[in-house]
Amino acid sequence: MGATGSSQLEKEISTTESVNNANEHYYGLVNFGNTCYCNSVIQALFFCRPFREKVLNYKQTLKKSGASKDNLVTCLADLFHSIASQKRRVGTIAPKRFITKLKKENELFDNYMQQDAHEFFNYLINTISETLIQEKIAEREKASRHGTLKKGNVTVNLAPATAGLPRSDEKGTSERNGGITVEGNEFLNKSDTTTWIHEIFQGILTNETRCLSCETVSSKDEDFLDLSIDVEQNTSISHCLRVFSETETLCGDQKYFCETCSSKQEAQKRMRIKKPPQLLALHLKRFKFVEPLNRHTKLSYRVVFPLELRLFNVSDDAEYGDRMYDLVATVVHCGATPNRGHYITLVKSNSFWLVFDDDIVEKLEVSSMEEFSGMSTDANIQMPPGNQSAPQKNSESAYILFYQARDYAADDPNHNHKGKNSTHSV
């Protein structure tokens, strides 16, 4: 971003910004060759204030302890601190150290090809969580060298940040989202395997199954750090979440084995939210394999996303069942395929929105948000008869949405939910 552009944006921001938000910084990130997938997620997480504060606190804690570490978390913390401590409010910064560390840690990202922003998001939060857990293990080992907790032979089984894998309450199995097994089949306390990643992003789904013969209802809980939901043409986030929790009938070869009946029976099952997370990360499944093309392509369906969201697909015993969410950031994919295109980020800073396009930062009118919902007709997968290699139209479509719980932001002076934003219920 040039000096003229930076000063102009700074003037625009100063005229609309509240006093509480006067110390916020808006810095574009340099693209090191198709690293927009990384830049877009970093910008989104930077403006998820609970996440940013935890990252900055991590750096401060290390500084106080005098410890010197070189991992992906410290690289991210240094980047966040560098942005937050700049003298100018607006500018550009190069995340070179973070990108270098990322490529060194994971060969998937060690190239100049376009990567999937959602895969990077999953990798980042799981890596942070695993690092924090390992640090807790090291601290406990150091504090209990003469205790019952033995040193060495420690295995960290960190679950992926997606819904759908079972929680295990049985001793001897790895627990969901960070079960720790130590020598002698001993388990660390749950507090040792719960990190601030879980505190911020983790929710609980409950899979309810009702036998249609005896009416017995069984349930199974599953932790999640984000939700991946299917998309349909000309719909909304509310509709997609309703479909996610639709009742499914199990019959024929899919019959359910009922413990009460001791036999396979027809049943109905549905997935509902038992514990809504503090920060809800929604991933729209926009990429699918198309057989005529023999490759993955993009579903540029128009899916309207609200600025305010209330979840109603919750279980009867749900914690915070009436929780209201505010949209704080959106990662947008521009292009026709997973491996081609570009990522940008829309973020909310107090009373206004901005768009981050690598090193370019611009204000965004709320009225323009709908332009990033996708296309009303999906030109990407429609092909003229006899022509399977027709040109594909690009589109700007919301890909990852970050909704922050309003009660979670109650003490955040920079979070303002006043205004005439649309509210959609699920």
Curated annotation (Swiss-Prot):
* Region (Disordered), start-end ranges: 162-181
Localization annotation: Perikaryon; Cytoplasm
Q: In which tissues is it expressed?
A: Expressed in a number of tissues including the nervous system, pharynx, body wall muscle, vulva muscle and intestine and is detected in many head and ventral cord neurons.
Null phenotype? Decreased levels of glr-1 in the ventral nerve cord and corresponding defects in glr-1-dependent behaviors including reduced spontaneous reversal frequency and reduced responsiveness to the nose touch assay which normally induces backward locomotion. Increased levels of ubiquitinated glr-1.
Which GO cellular component term is one of those annotated?
A: nucleus
Q: What is the effect of changing C36A?
A: Abolishes the increased glr-1 expression associated with coexpression of usp-46 with wdr-20 and wdr-48. Does not rescue the decreased glr-1 levels seen in usp-46 mutants. No effect on interaction with glr-1
Classification via InterPro entries: Papain-like_cys_pep_sf (IPR038765), Peptidase_C19 (IPR050164), Peptidase_C19_UCH (IPR001394), USP_CS (IPR018200), USP_dom (IPR028889)
Main localization, broad class:
other
User: Any one Gene Ontology biological process term?
Assistant: positive regulation of gene expression
Q: Write the Enzyme Commission number(s) for this entry.
A: 3.4.19.12
For this UniProt record, the keywords arranged alphabetically read as follows: Cytoplasm, Hydrolase, Lipoprotein, Myristate, Protease, Thiol protease, Ubl conjugation pathway
Q: Which reaction does it catalyse?
A: Thiol-dependent hydrolysis of ester, thioester, amide, peptide and isopeptide bonds formed by the C-terminal Gly of ubiquitin (a 76-residue protein attached to proteins as an intracellular targeting signal)
Task: State the lipidation positions (N-myristoyl glycine).
Answer: G2
Q: How does it assemble?
A: Interacts with wdr-20 and wdr-48; the catalytic activity of usp-46 is increased in the presence of both wdr-20 and wdr-48. Interacts with glr-1; the interaction results in deubiquitination of glr-1.
Membership in a protein family: Belongs to the peptidase C19 family.
What is the purpose of this protein? Regulates the abundance of the glr-1 glutamate receptor in the ventral nerve cord by promoting its deubiquitination and preventing its degradation in the lysosome. Contributes to the regulation of embryonic polarity.
UniProt-recorded name of the protein:
Ubiquitin carboxyl-terminal hydrolase 46
